[in-house]
Amino acid sequence: MRKCKIFVGNSHPELGNMVCQRLGIEPAPCTLKKFANGETSVQIGVSVRDEDVYVIQSGSPSINDDIMELLILVSACRGGSARKITAVIPQFPYSKQCKMKRHRGAITARMLANLLVMAGADHVVSMDLHASQMQGFFTKPVDNLYGGPSLAKWIRENVEDYEDAVVVSKNPGGTKRVTALADSLKINFAMIHTDRRRSKDLYSQNKDLQQLKLRKQSMLRKNRPIIRQGDHPNEEENIILSNGIQTARIRNGHVIGDDEADDDEDAILESDSELHSIDGLDSHGLGGTYDAVDSEDEEEIPVLYREQLITLVGNVRGRSAIILDDMIDRPGSFISAAEHLVQNCGAKKVYVVATHGIFTGDCLEELEKSDAIDTIVVTNTYPISGERIAGSKKLVTIDVSPIFAECIRRDHYGESISVLFDSLAAL
C-alpha cells in the first residue's frame, strides 16, 4: 500500500499489529512516552506529507491517557501535512455517555467527537457504537462497522442446534440489536424486562409476601391466546402475541425463590421523601433508562431497588439462550438474566455474547463463577490481559482484525466498504 502510514497507539498494540500484518505493512515508527510530570509526548519518526494516515487507538483501562495520546498523534500528523487522517477506534471511549442523563450533565461522547475533529481527524472508523445516533456527533464521515456478522458466524459454528436457539435482549434498549442478529440467523428472539418501580410499589403498599405471589401468578399467562373474530361468520382466529411470560424476583443481583423471606425489609422500604426523590429518576433495572435507544445497565442500584421483578417475554424452554449486548462491562445484569433463564425459564444453555469485552474490575471472574453461564463470547476490540484469558475457561475471543484491515485497504484505494456491512461478511 503506497502513500499509506498506519500508527499504532499504546492502548491495544496487539490488535494494531495484527491489522498491519494482514495488510502486509509495518506500523509507522513513532515514539510514545510520558514526561516525569505525567504529560504525554508523541514523536513521529517518518514523513507523512501527502500520505493517507490511519491511527489505531481503542479504549483501554488507561482510557484518559490513551485518548490524549490519540489526539496528539492526530494533531502531529495534521501538522506534518498528511493528506487524510483516519482515526480507527474499535471501541469508542465514553460511548455510554452519549446523552444527558441528569440535569447539569455532559454529553461526553459528543465532546470527544468534537475534540477528534478539532485535532485534525478527517474520518473515523469504529465498531458497534453504543448508540448508532452517535455518528451524528461528528462533522466528518464515520463508518460504524458491525461485529454482528462475526458473532453470527461463531454461533453457527459452535452453538449446538443453533437453529432452535433464542437470542435474548436483557433490556428493552437492546431489542434492535437482538432482532438484527436473530434475523441474520433466522431464529427466534426474546426480551427481558426488569421493573424496579413495580417491585418498590408492591412492597411499599403490601408487605405480605402472599401479595407478591398473587401478583406474579397474574402475570404468568403462558401461551394464552387472544381470540378475535375471523373473516367469516362463526369463525375465530387465535392470535398468540408471545410464547410465554415468566416472572421472578431478584435480590442483590440474583434470582430468588417466591418462598424466600424478606430478610431485610427495612432496607427495601424507605421514607416517603426518599421514595419521592428516586421516583424522579426514569431508570430501568437492567437497562439504564427507559429510553429505547439506550441499554445501560451499569448504574449502581440503590438499596430501595435491590429487590426487583424480572420478566422474560418469549420462550427458551429446552433451548440455548444467547444473551446479546454491545459490551460486557459489569456482571450483575448478565448474571441475573442468565439465572432467570436457567432456573425459571428452562433454558438448556446460556451464552453471553457481546462485541466489546471491557470486563471492569472482577467482572470476568464473576461471570466465570456463575453456574448459569456456559460460555462468554467477545471480540478483541478491547484489550484483555493474557493472564485473564488464560485463567478463564468460559471466555472465547473472536478476532476482528480482518474487518478493520479490509476497511483500511478499501478506504485507501477508494473502494466501497458496504460489503463490510453485509450480513454475509463474517470475515
UniProtKB/Swiss-Prot annotation:
Biological or metabolic pathway of the protein: Metabolic intermediate biosynthesis; 5-phospho-alpha-D-ribose 1-diphosphate biosynthesis; 5-phospho-alpha-D-ribose 1-diphosphate from D-ribose 5-phosphate (route I): step 1/1
Domain of life per record: Eukaryota
Keywords: ATP-binding, Cytoplasm, Kinase, Magnesium, Metal-binding, Nucleotide biosynthesis, Nucleotide-binding, Phosphoprotein, Transferase
Gene Ontology molecular-function annotations: ATP binding; kinase activity; magnesium ion binding; ribose phosphate diphosphokinase activity
Cellular localization per UniProt: Cytoplasm
GO CC annotation: cytoplasm; cytoplasmic stress granule; ribose phosphate diphosphokinase complex
Keyword Metal-binding tagged: yes
InterPro entries: PRib_PP_synth_CS, Pribosyltran_N, PRibTrfase_dom, PRTase-like, Rib-P_diPkinase
Reaction equations catalysed: D-ribose 5-phosphate + ATP = 5-phospho-alpha-D-ribose 1-diphosphate + AMP + H(+)
Annotated Mg(2+) binding sites: D128, H130, D143
Biological process according to GO: 5-phosphoribose 1-diphosphate biosynthetic process; purine nucleotide biosynthetic process; ribonucleoside monophosphate biosynthetic process
Entry-annotated residues carrying Phosphoserine: S199, S218, S271, S295
Protein EC: 2.7.6.1
Pfam families found in the cross-reference section: Pribosyl_synth, Pribosyltran_N
Further comment: Present with 11700 molecules/cell in log phase SD medium.
Role noted for this protein: 5-phosphoribose 1-diphosphate synthase involved in nucleotide, histidine, and tryptophan biosynthesis. Active in heteromultimeric complexes with other 5-phosphoribose 1-diphosphate synthases (PRS2, PRS3, PRS4 and PRS5).
Annotated family: Belongs to the ribose-phosphate pyrophosphokinase family.
Designated name of the protein: Ribose-phosphate pyrophosphokinase 1
Organism encoding this protein: Saccharomyces cerevisiae (strain ATCC 204508 / S288c)
Organism lineage: Eukaryota, Fungi, Dikarya, Ascomycota, Saccharomycotina
